[in-house]
């Protein structure tokens, strides 16, 4: 049992401060308490990622990071503040709207005294507005009274006027609806004879100081406003001859109206900003103008565990070790071990590279940032490098953490291949990635995982130790691994007990894990379509064919002659394969059209998943591919060969060219390799060998093709009887499988199913012939009866004579009379 320093200090204190009788009891209690704490820690580590109890608690074995902040906290605070401002703005709009009114809203208002230098206007809504400033002046033109006043506002004074018709009687100015009460069109007001100055003496009396004659008259003058009167208008200015322009309406400007004039712009800006943020979130942050330079990585939340991954046990163990290091780093630090800074997964598509990354995300109790390699680059220069920095900064704040870059070949390909501007810009992103992984500013506590299908195109600096220390190749599964994958994906499917998953795995060589999952899914859909409660071998066979060549096109109209030629073509593949050593075993032949293929032959290796292939195996594959064309030539002639061998010739050409230029299997060309690797192909670069060598390669390819075709032609010529039996079986059954093919090969006769189908068709043909014959006989008899009826009608009728009616016919009149007597 190992103790840390703190536990050793506690034990030492117990030994010093307790007597010998109590030492053991205290020590036992301490051990019990320590074991409980360790059990709690272990349970929290073993708890799955989707458990609801401790999802939000940090792992006890993980070191706390003081720099780590709750993600999105500042953003939530900012958005809360913006929402509060918007709500308060709307409330202010509602409240302040009650304090804004225009002159046209005045109803039965009156002037009352308010101090010595201001007037108060009271409206029908019991709202009061104070008009302050210099003493107002009354002008009169014709019979119109103009009350001019100055209003104090935020930025100075507004010149305002009240227009009303007036008739003076007993020092009282009565206001009525005159011709100018609505203002009419804009007119110039000349400064006319001054009638009176309105002064307030503080006692509530309004005096009329001067009249038309210049004399002063005392007494109170009252001004009442009519309810239908346009009562206030703003003067736009004074001219040099003291004239002024009066608009047709006027509104009072208050503090509320100023706020209301600005508030719509604030609301509009807030709505636009909010909409742009929502658009950025809806698009995953890709097209948001506010996050051009930010990383597009997301925190992955996966429910996939290592127990859900089958068929790649060695690769899984490599990643389990990394997850264990993240959970228990002290165990490795005690031994002086350094965790790999980077792990790259490479292999063919569909083999489970991304699935392994999901399992790491589900098992690890650390933040897992997932991003695609193409998400770094954008239309702006320098965005890629900026996003790389932002990604690693996020990961460091959450350390220990894992970064997973899917399809890293889009950002980490070899530098300087084409020496173009676009290439140099892409190199900036790669250089920043190299610096972040292992540069002067190396970030600790961050592990980088990546996946690619093309390891050969990646830059060497990216693959060196210190960046991607561990390279894990994920290959296609062998037969045992395919069985394990099928069992994993069949856990939630109702598969019949009669189905042999090992047989399905044997018939699917070269299938990836994704293809095997697709086979089971297609079989499930077919079972549902056929109203079956379980999945049987028939559905799985059809699903394999659908994955290989697509769905069957049974409604396609194909003539009998085309079917015969397709059958001879496929039979040629099968016969050459059966008589060629090292060739693949024929599992199935069909002439049902699927996809672009009019028919196909399914072959599997005799020995599953060979690590290497011999020259004889490759030559046997080429001969089998050429068997279809040879069979057509033998049975139809050179002038009647078809285009059905196009795909066969394409595959055979690739095999032969690889034998000559890559594998060194040609004695004339030699061992030199003239086949460039995939990552170094440059469309602007010429061939790296001479023209004479190129001609030699072409001649050698042509020689191998000629030899293999003659070999296939010879086999089909010798065993053409078997070819014809296979063709007849295909025309009867459309699809034959391995037991039926082996029966034909062994006994040189039709299999049982073909004979039964042939007998059924013969009986059907006999029945159709009988029906056709009976129909003809019935038609003939009916024709004879009609002729006899015609003859009877033509015969001479005679009551006394019993002789045959060979006499000439009577006159029509006599016949008609005798008929009448009858």
Curated annotation (Swiss-Prot):
Record keywords: ATP-binding, Cell membrane, Hydrolase, Membrane, Metal-binding, Metalloprotease, Nucleotide-binding, Protease, Transmembrane, Transmembrane helix, Zinc
Transmembrane segments: 77-97, 252-272
Topological domain ranges for the Extracellular compartment: 98-251
Cellular component GO terms held in the UniProt record: plasma membrane
Biased composition (Basic and acidic residues): 758-794, 812-822
Subcellular location per the Swiss-Prot or TrEMBL entry: Cell membrane
GO biological-process terms attached to the record: protein catabolic process; proteolysis
Subunit composition and interactions: Homohexamer.
Protein's UniProt name: ATP-dependent zinc metalloprotease FtsH
Species, as recorded: Malacoplasma penetrans (strain HF-2) (Mycoplasma penetrans)
Gene: ftsH
